[in-house]
Amino acid sequence: MKPALKIAIAGLGTVGAGVIQLLDRQAELLAVRAGRRIIVSAVSARDRRRDRGVDLSAARWYEDAAAMAADPEIDVVVELIGGSEGVAPAVIEAALAHKKHVVTANKALMAEHGTRLAARAEE
């Protein structure tokens, strides 16, 4: 089996916590389908003390989501912050600058910056 795919999640609201829960619950099936384990190795959110109902003990915590996206140990950055300005585009820019794969469902960000970010991803 290949080395684990290390995921960083920026934004731990309802969707972010749900993604972590789903990845944990479906870990065996995902590992078989992907040919390697998929682990959440880093997270970032505004409030570290908030109880999100998921176990984050195995993940490194980052106060700065863009710094997390630049971490050389991370393979994929999942942006779940939302909004088209501020932190969300900075996280994606940092991830792309460090040749990371990026996952987002942020329609506002993609509508405003999608063309530029797609070009950046192709560099």
Describe the function of each predicted region.
Residues 77, 102-103:
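Hydrophobic residues within beta-strands of alpha/beta enzymes
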